[in-house]
Amino acid sequence: FLDEIYNNMFKEIFKLLKPQVNQIHNIRCWNNSAIAVMGFFFNDKEMLDFVFHGEYNIIRQIKEGVTKDGFWYEGSIHYNFFTLEGITPTLLFASIYNYDFDPEAKAIVRNMFVSAYNYAFTNLYLPNPNDGWPSINLKTYSYIYSVAAKVFSSDKEIVNILKIILNNKYPRT
């Protein structure tokens, strides 16, 4: 059954997504991540080589797409989290499958989570510069911080940020 799904669906999805990974962009992070998850699950070397060594690989996306202050280059809180939603599953699966994720890129992603927290107001609502949704708080992104806490489990700052978010009195927006 899994072989049929792999050969008839996931290999085809890879063929569809591969040419779309053609620039540094938040959606390309999602494309790379989808390919990475398939590659890890099915132990597909071609998929994993593409994700980690292709021209617009996930490491390059992170290193070139994230500013020095830990924010996605498109300049929107929404795009920053949208990008994190795309990148974080790759980090999680790399951890689960004992893949040596580039330490510098991993540190950049960690910094993205911390920076986003630092951008929030004291009530954990986020500013809305540029394109995005108004009146959003960090509780909206608690699920992605939960994954980050798993990926960075020994990092007390990330774990504490998650606790602060979950214990915030304001409802998820």
Protein language model regions, located:
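Active-site lining segments of carbohydrate-active enzymes
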Residues: 1-78, 82, 88-89, 169-172
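Carbohydrate-active enzyme catalytic cores, enriched for enzymes
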Residues: 36, 78, 82-173
